């Protein structure tokens, strides 16, 4: 039944796209997508030997606007994988999607960006330095195979929904249930953004629990500064009842000049009944960002991790993060 519903939704998108394509065409246009994240890092104290240059991640792709609201995009993600030695890099297809926008409605299908923490990541604004909270602590994936829709009811209210496989873009499965998500974004006044999201990731095994995710966010961008905070709850990690994770993140930045930003962030991750105590932590990152022309950014930053495991020592790292992209 679920497969039929998904197929019907995909066919509806395809039929609407066909109708749009038959209308008077606009001049097509495209652009390359190139983003490279790298760094030099060095630890202090117990991490003194953890130092070196690192090519963290590269995104290579192309986006093409066909006209009449129709757009296609393909992006390759080249980065680290937990499945192989840390020195190796694996290439994945992160996005292979087609989207159609008409009026206040936008439909997207294929290997698409998810809606779980997309807004928080954009507001944080320093993805090449560190992932946003939910991505950093593996509350969900940034892309997956499925369909999504968003509708702008008013200038201050937009809602979105998504149905995807639920395993992310690195593990494209088809037999382990689906993930459903629903979100709403409010912008009641200029500069102020609020968002709430709920997601349910089905388990194909009746003896195991469904995963659930609740995310809330509020942020304000003013002239030359921004500040935001988010609270996240992730229930039944690994489809195990009681394996709940929760935490919050606070981040902000100040524009010191046209080419210089000052930024800081505090994360706090906890687990129910301390089941994840070995990885629970609070963490701080702070630093500067310098823009060297249009395509290059350099960001020296200091990081401190404070584990919640009893008798565990704090860890300190210094980074020089680098970005190239257009």
Q: What do the PLM-derived regions correspond to, one by one?
A:
Residues 12-14, 78, 304:
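Alpha-helical transmembrane segments and their juxtamembrane interfaces
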Residues 1-25:
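Cleavable N-terminal export/targeting peptides
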Residues 171-175:
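Active-site cleft segment of glycoside hydrolase catalytic domains centered on the general acid/base Glu
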Residues 114, 170, 291:
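Short, electropositive, low-hydrophobicity segments enriched in small/polar residues
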Residues 2-3, 180, 184:
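Structural motif marking the loop-to-transmembrane transition
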Residues 9-10, 154, 257-260:
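Conserved long hydrophobic alpha-helices within structured protein cores
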Residues 23-166, 176-178, 185-194, 263:
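Outer membrane beta-barrel
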Residues 26-28, 33, 37-49, 84-88, ...:
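Outer-membrane beta-barrel pore domains
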């Amino acid at each position: 039944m679920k497969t039929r519903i998904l197929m019907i939704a995909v066919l509806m998108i395809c039929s609407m796209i066909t109708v749009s394509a038959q209308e008077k065409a606009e001049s097509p246009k495209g652009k390359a997508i190139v983003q490279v994240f790298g760094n030099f890092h060095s630890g202090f104290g117990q991490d003194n030997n953890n130092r070196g240059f690192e090519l963290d991640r590269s995104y290579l792709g192309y986006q093409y606007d066909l006209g009449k609201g129709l757009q296609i995009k393909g992006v390759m993600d080249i980065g680290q994988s937990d499945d192989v030695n840390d020195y190796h890099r694996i290439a994945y297809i992160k996005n292979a999607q087609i989207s159609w926008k008409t009026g206040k409605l936008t439909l997207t299908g294929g290997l698409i960006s998810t809606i779980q923490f997309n807004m928080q990541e954009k507001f944080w604004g320093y993805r090449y330095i560190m992932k946003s909270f939910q991505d950093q602590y593996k509350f969900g994936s940034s892309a997956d195979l499925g369909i999504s829709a968003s509708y702008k009811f008013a200038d201050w209210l937009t809602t979105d929904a998504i149905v995807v496989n639920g395993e992310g873009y690195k593990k494209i499965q088809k037999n382990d249930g689906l993930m459903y998500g629903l979100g709403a974004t409010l912008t009641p006044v200029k500069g102020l953004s609020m968002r709430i999201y709920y997601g349910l990731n089905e388990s194909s095994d009746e003896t195991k629990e469904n995963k659930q995710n609740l995310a809330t966010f509020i942020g304000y961008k003013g002239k030359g500064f921004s500040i935001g905070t988010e609270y996240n709850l992730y229930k039944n990690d690994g489809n195990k009842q009681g394996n709940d994770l929760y935490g919050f993140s606070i981040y902000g930045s100040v524009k010191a000049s046209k080419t210089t930003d000052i930024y800081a962030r505090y994360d706090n991750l906890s687990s129910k009944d301390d089941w994840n105590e070995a990885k629970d932590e609070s963490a701080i990152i702070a630093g500067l960002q310098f823009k060297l022309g249009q395509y290059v950014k350099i960001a020296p930053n200091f990081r401190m991790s404070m584990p919640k495991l009893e008798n565990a020592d704090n860890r300190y790292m210094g980074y020089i993060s680098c970005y190239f992209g257009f």
